[in-house]
UniProtKB/Swiss-Prot annotation:
A zinc finger (CCHC-type) spans 1417-1434. The gene is CLIP1. It comes from Homo sapiens. This is CAP-Gly domain-containing linker protein 1. The keyword Membrane applies. The modification Phosphothreonine is found at T50, T140, T182, T1310.
Length: 1438
């Protein structure tokens, strides 16, 4: 590669993020801090080398991420005109770019608008980066890290090592960053270490964004200090911005930008910067007491900050040793020297001994405190290491399972690819066989055409018996041609399937490659993890004491307690969610009932539509009967015409006149009926969309019947013409009369053809409207389905959001409780001694661990939610694919129908061509006969004048026919206008229907909102009802008792009444019997009648009592039902009360658990105080054992070393956790890749659909041109018939001339010569006309053949060369320019369309009005004027 210009890219930072992975440590990296500025200046030259390495690694077509968050594919790599150096052009997946592949009028690649972007290769990554890396902190220079606050430390620690910036950074290792060694910390630089620790705490962007508040002290760009005055979004740029009031006039404004004020300050003191460029400053404590008390904390803070920066094990051990030395110096060496000096001064006297004893006791207390601190840290480290080892084991198992699954998937994909390859080979074999068959068929067709020519020559000699053979051969040829077409379509289908299989194999191979890459990466990561595990195994804590083990066990018990608490909370939350889900299911059931109502309404509308369809079918049946009667009358008229051929001229003319009047009447009736039907369709189309389908089907049947009748008429006409030819040979005298009849028949045929054309136009327009209606129905269905899916998704989202809100509220409540408890504990712990401080540190560590656990759980939940959303999007894309495939199948079926229609048209054209050939042969025979006759005889001038008169008469007839043609065309145009009006009305009705649909949709949405409001009100009412329930229960109980008592009373009363009625019935029956006996005895009519009346009264009374009994039974049943319902309600209320009581008990249990924890903490504090007293007692004993303390110091140092090792292991485990998080991100990226692949497949399907639509439009145009050619052929046929008639007239005139010559022999030879010359000239003229007509016929045949071949092969470019006689010599013409956006030819191409250009081609002229003496701001990063390097946006792209 050629040497590149220095791009001014920043050197990578030496600060390591907490989320980054562990890297290789350099062997020898030593450079003073004073040389950082020179290394920064020198970084411009090696940056070109890094760019070369980036360009070498990346390739065109590779999948990358711009700044770690914008996915796309590389389409360009190299130098550009708009800026020096190497640039990469990327096509993004989403329209969030800046161009369409062209910048400043120069095109580097082609893509959709706002999807193209140009960046430096160093900004590209092959994986999705974390947020802090993607925001641009990856490439901040070392000069920014050295703030004004830490200049003192930089000056004092001049010998601290720093890595050189010349080492390039490859993109294949995106997480690789250079470690920076931390300077040694001395006792003199406490304030500097405090400021450095404060700055290091604000290292991560996320923390900075969370902690920034208005009024905070911050640094902008690492150099400008100030106070935050504004936080939020602005009008001048997108994203979150921070408005800072600087300490010095180094800003750009006074708090206002572009006329809008965000805060108030002095001019040049205001500055706006993105949030990720602003870092918070912490202030060190100034009081000496606090500094002495928190010396250990400061040292720990500095060591942790330095550990975060340096990943290497050597730097970590050195920092831990430095920290231990710093913490131990004031306690051991300093005090020892002081005691020795005091012993030297005050040897004599008891006071000196007492002071020495006090100092030693203080020294022992400090040593004990440090020992306790170290023990606590070791315990924490061991517990943390155990947990991380368990997590590592789980991660290893998961990784092994994932690897096995990936291998299984790989095997499946390989089998799939092999099967696809086999299918491909089989399809290729089939293609070759089909091609062979096609070639054989073409050879057969050529042979048949040769034999056809021979047979036609023979048919001139023998007429009748061989005509049948020729017809059979023609039929064979047609069958062969049809089979050829079938084989061609088969071949086309096979080719398409081959292309589809190729695309599928390519996509599967790319998937396999990606999976193999992922496998290799995973295997490497596993190997690295194993190596680290083997290298970082603990050496075995042999010297750990029993006290440490006891503390570990106590901590484990606390952890178990917290876990049980968490599990209880989770179970309570699950129960809460279950209740919520039940309520949601009830709401869904209510919605289902509403949908059922709507479906019933739809069914009623459908029944109305069916009724309307029946009415329309009756109208069509009437119209059909009328058409049939008209066709029958037309056929009768044709038969009468045939009969009238044998009769005289007068009767024929009258019949023709009658026929014409009848036809005109028929046309008028037909037009009136069509107008009536159109009016009906206009009025009913909006309400009855399905009527059109039935009408169209029946119309098609009618048209087919008409076409059949027309074909029958044509066949009859052909037979009549044959008869006329026979009669011409027999009787030459009746030729003139027959010519007139034939002309009239031709006029009728022309009119029939016009009618057929009009009908064809109608059918084509009806088909177009049908297709539009189908498309509209499909779109409506798709929109309704999409809307329903959207509603479902919205409901699910709302439910999920509600659940999340409830969880957040509960979390906040618990966190507030926990914070209040921790505050109380801290207040108590401040009063305790150094041991209580150790306890507080333990609790802080525990809290940090819990926070980390919560963060990890939240990340895991987010990842699972994202995976679910990705799966949903995948399912949606699959559904869309299925819909597209269905549309594709519909269009392909339409294409096949159109091709079948073309084939039918071509068959008709071929039949007409055969007829033309027969006529041409007959014409040639006649011409030969005329030539022979003209040679033999002469003609007179009188005959010539007669000929001219006849010609004039025929020309007049032609003019009259042309006038009739124009009238017919006007009628056709009128019909077309009426059809257009119909289409406009149909579109209006469709628009109205769409509007109605939208209104209904809005009403449904309103109803939904009303239902939601009702649900809220119902919830409130439920709460009120719960309050009222307790009152209502007591009231209902009392009412129940009263009602039961009343019912019992009524039952007793009714039973008494029943008994009385029964007794009365029995008494009455006895009386009846007595009366009957008396009636028998008396046998009188009056007494019998009286008895009958009494019987009737008794029966009436009995029926009344029975009815009252039934009424009482019904009332009893009703009351029992009411009792049952009240009991059920009572049970429900009791259940709800029990649930509320259970919730109260759960909350009480939580409160008791919190109280128990507080009590345990109090007990722990008491135990610690007891331990303190015990330790004070032990201090006296330890004073005697000062000699042994030195050995303990050495053991203490060993413990410190072990602690440093454990700290290193902790850091490495954190790094591994970050690696696992990155693995999850990579899995997300792979899912996004699969989504992009599906979207690409969708775009391909859309492109195929557009191609098919274009082919359909081309075929329709070709159909129209074929119809126009058909009309031209018919006019030529009519001209041919006229010429044949002229030839026959000439033959008759020749015969008459011969007779006259035989009679008049006295004419002179000179006149005969002149007549012969005149006749010869006429014959030459006629011959030239015939030759011209033949040429026209040949040209038209060529055009028709070209059109048919183009329609079959799908190539429209061959039609440009049909006019050329020598096609082989001429070169093909260039294709015409066509714009798909504007739909116009010859203006411009789609790539050069002005509507596509969204940005101005020429950049605007820059005018600068500054003074020449001022220094213009220049950025070394962008290599542009207008701003300084400190104000540069790192994420700048083109």
């Amino acid at each position: 590669m050629s040497m590149l210009k220095p791009s001014g890219l920043k050197a990578p930072t030496k600060i390591l993020k907490p989320g980054s992975t562990a890297l290789k440590t350099p062997t020898a990296v030593v450079a003073p801090v004073e040389k950082t500025i020179s290394s920064e200046k020198a970084s411009s030259t090696p940056s070109s080398e890094t760019q070369e390495e980036f360009v070498d690694d990346f390739r065109v077509g590779e999948r990358v991420w711009v700044n770690g968050n914008k996915p796309g594919f590389i389409q360009f790599l190299g130098e550009t005109q708009f800026a020096p150096g190497q640039w990469a052009g990327i096509v993004l997946d989403e329209p969030i770019g800046k161009n369409d592949g062209s910048v400043a009028g120069v095109r580097y690649f082609q893509c959709e608008p706002l999807k193209g972007i140009f960046t430096r290769p160093s900004k590209l990554t092959r994986k999705v980066q974390a947020e802090d890396e993607a925001n641009g902190l990856q490439t901040t220079p070392a000069s920014r890290a050295t703030s004004p606050l830490c200049t003192s430390t930089a000056s004092m620690v001049s010998s601290s090592p720093s890595t050189p910036s010349n080492i390039p950074q490859k993109p294949s290792q995106p997480a690789a960053k250079e470690p920076s060694a931390t300077p040694p910390i001395s006792n003199l630089t406490k304030t500097a270490s405090e400021s450095i620790s404060n700055l290091s705490e604000a290292g991560s962007i996320k923390k900075g964004e969370r902690e920034l508040k208005i009024g905070d002290r911050v640094l902008v760009g690492g150099t400008k200090a100030g106070v935050v005055r504004f936080l939020g979004e602005t009008d001048f740029a997108k994203g979150e911005w921070c408005g800072v009031e600087l300490d010095e006039p180094l800003g750009k404004n006074d708090g206002a930008v572009a006329g809008t004020r965000y805060f108030q300050c002095q001019p040049k003191y205001g500055l706006f910067a993105p949030v990720h460029k602003v870092t918070k400053i912490g202030f060190p404590s100034t009081t000496p007491a606090k500094a002495k008390a928190n010396a250990v904390r400061r040292v720990m803070a500095t060591t942790s900050a330095s550990l975060k920066r340096s990943p290497s094990a050597s730097s970590l051990s050195s920092m831990s040793s430095v920290a231990s030395s710093v913490s131990s110096r004031p306690s051991r060496t300093g005090l020892l020297t002081e005691t020795s000096s005091r012993y030297a001064r005050k040897i004599s006297g008891t006071t000196a001994l007492q002071e020495a004893l006090k100092e030693k006791q203080q020294h022992i207390e400090q040593l004990l405190a440090e020992r306790d601190l170290e023990r606590a840290e070791v315990a924490k480290a061991t517990s943390h290491v155990g947990e991380i080892e368990q997590e590592l084991a789980l991660a290893r198992d998961g990784h092994d399972q994932h690897v096995l699954e990936l291998e299984a998937k790989m095997d499946q994909l390989r089998t799939m690819v092999e099967a696809a390859d086999r299918e491909k080979v089989e399809l290729l074999n089939q293609l070759e066989e089909e091609k062979r068959k096609v070639e054989d068929l073409q050879f057969r067709v050529e042979e048949e055409s040769i034999t056809k020519g021979d047979l036609e020559q023979k048919s001139q000699i023998s007429e009748d018996p061989e005509n049948t053979q020729t017809k059979l051969e023609h039929a064979r040829i047609k069958e062969l041609e049809q089979s050829l077409l079938f084989e061609k379509t088969k071949a086309d289908k096979l080719q398409r399937e081959l292309e589809d299989t190729r695309v599928a194999t390519v996509s599967e191979k790319s998937r396999i490659m990606e999976l193999e890459k992922d496998l290799a990466l995973r295997v490497q990561e596993v190997a690295e993890l194993r190596r680290r595990l083997e290298s970082n195994k603990p050496a075995g804590d042999v010297d750990m004491s029993l006290s440490l083990l006891q503390e570990i066990s106590s901590l484990q018990e606390k952890l178990e307690v917290t876990r049980t608490d968490h599990q209880r909370e989770i179970t309570s939350l699950k129960e809460h969610f279950g209740a919520r889900e039940e309520t949601h299911q009830k709401e869904i059931k209510a919605l289902y009932t509403a949908t059922e109502k709507l479906s019933k309404e739809n069914e009623s509308l459908k029944s109305k539509l069916e009724h309307a369809n029946k009415e329309n079918s009756d109208v069509i049946a009437l119209w059909k009967s009328k058409l049939e009667t008209a066709i029958a009358s037309h056929q009768q008229a044709m038969e009468e015409l045939k009969v009238s051929f044998s009769k005289g001229l007068g009767t024929e003319t009258a019949e023709f006149a009658e026929l014409k009047t009848q036809i005109e009447k028929m046309r008028l009736d037909y037009q009136h009926e069509i107008e009536n039907l159109q009016n009906q369709q206009d009025s009913e189309r909006a309400a009855h969309a399905k009527e059109m389908e039935a009408l169209r089907a029946k119309l098609m049947k009618v048209i087919k019947e008409k076409e059949n009748s027309l074909e029958a008429i044509r066949s009859k006409l052909d037979k009549a013409e044959d008869q006329h030819l026979v009669e011409m040979e027999d009787t030459l005298n009746k030729l003139q009369e027959a010519e007139i009849k034939v002309k009239e028949l031709e006029v009728l045929q022309a009119k029939c053809n016009e009618q057929t054309k009009v009908i064809d136009n109608f059918t084509s327009q009806l088909k177009a409207t049908e297709e539009k209606l189908l498309d509209l129905d499909a779109l409506r269905k798709a929109s309704s389905e999409g809307k329903s899916e959207m509603k479902k998704l919205r409901q699910q989202l709302e439910a999920a959001e509600k659940q999340i809100k409830h969880l957040e509220i509960e979390k906040n409540a618990e966190s507030s409780k926990a914070s209040s408890i921790t505050r109380e504990l801290q207040g108590r712990e401040l009063k305790l001694t150094n041991l209580q401080e150790n306890l507080s540190e333990v609790s802080q560590v525990k809290e940090t661990l819990e926070k980390e656990l919560q963060i990890l759980k939240e990340k895991f939940a987010e990842a699972s939610e994202e995976a679910v959303s990705v799966q949903r999007s995948m399912q949606e894309t699959v559904n869309k694919l299925h819909q597209k495939e269905e549309q594709f199948n519909m269009l392909s079926s339409d294409l096949e129908k159109l091709r079948e229609n073309l084939a039918d048209m071509e068959a008709k054209f071929r039949e007409k061509d055969e007829r033309e050939e027969q006529l041409i042969k007959a014409k040639e025979k006649l011409e030969n006969d005329i030539a022979e006759i003209m040679k033999m005889s002469g003609d007179n001038s009188s005959q010539l004048t007669k000929m001219n008169d006849e010609l004039r008469l025929k020309e007049r007839d032609v003019e009259e026919l042309q006038l009739k043609l124009t009238k017919a065309n006007e009628n056709a145009s009128f019909l077309q206008k009426s059809i257009e009006d119909m289409t406009v009305k149909a579109e209006q009705s469709q628009q109205e229907a769409a509007k109605k649909h939208e209104e209904e949709k809005k009403e449904l949405e309103r109803k939904l909102s009303d239902l939601e409001k009702k649900m809220e009100t119902s919830h409130n009412q439920c709460q009120e009802l719960k309050a009222r329930y307790e009152r209502a229960t007591s009231e209902t109980k009392t009412k129940h008792e009263e009602i039961l008592q009343n019912l019992q009373k009524t039952l007793l009363d009714t039973e008494d009444k029943l008994k009385g009625a029964r007794e009365e019935n029995s008494g009455l029956l006895q009386e009846l019997e007595e009366l009957r006996k008396q009636a028998d005895k008396a046998k009188a009519a009056q007494t019998a009648e009286d008895a009958m009346q009494i019987m009737e009264q008794m029966t009436k009374e009995k029926t009344e009592t029975l009815a009252s009994l039934e009424d009482t039974k019904q009332t009893n049943a009703k009351l029992q039902n009411e009792l049952d319902t009240l009991k059920e309600n009572n049970l429900k209320n009791v259940e709800e009360l029990n649930k509320s009581k259970e919730l109260l008990t759960v909350e009480n249990q939580k409160m008791e658990e919190f109280r128990k924890e507080i009590e345990t903490l109090k007990q722990a504090a008491a135990q610690k105080s007891q331990q303190l007293s015990a330790l004070q007692e032990e201090n006296v004993k330890l004073a005697e054992e000062l000699g042994r303390s030195r050995d303990e110091v050495t053991s203490h140092q060993k413990l410190e070393e072990e602690r440093s090792v454990l700290n290193n292991q902790l850091l490495e485990m954190k790094k591994r956790e970050s690696k696992f998080i990155k693995d999850a991100d990579e899995e997300k990226a792979s899912l996004q890749k699969s989504i992009s692949i599906t979207s690409a497949l969708l775009t391909e399907k859309d492109a195929e659909l557009e191609k098919l639509r274009n082919e359909v439009t081309v075929l329709r145009g070709e159909n129209a041109s074929a119809k126009s050619l058909h009309s031209v052929v018919q006019t030529l046929e009519s001209d041919k018939v006229k010429l044949e008639l002229k030839v026959k007239n000439l033959e008759l005139q020749l015969k008459e001339n011969k007779r006259q010559l035989s009679s008049s022999s006295g004419n002179t030879d000179t006149q005969a010569d002149e007549d012969e010359r005149a006749q010869e000239s006429q014959i030459d003229f006629l011959n030239s006309v015939i030759v011209d007509l033949q040429r026209k016929n040949q040209d038209l045949k060529m055009k028709v053949e070209m059109m048919s071949e183009a329609a079959l092969n799908g190539n429209g470019d061959d039609l440009n060369n049909y006019d050329s006689d020598d096609q082989e010599k001429q070169s093909k013409k260039k294709p015409r320019l066509f714009c798909d956006i504007c739909d116009c030819f010859d203006l411009h191409d789609t790539e050069d369309c002005p509507t596509q250009a969204q940005m101005s081609e020429d950049p605007p002229h820059s005018t600068h009005h500054g003074s020449r003496g001022e220094e213009r701001p220049y950025c070394e990063i962008c290599e542009m004027f207008g701003h300084w390097a400190t104000n540069c946006n790192d994420d700048e792209t083109f």
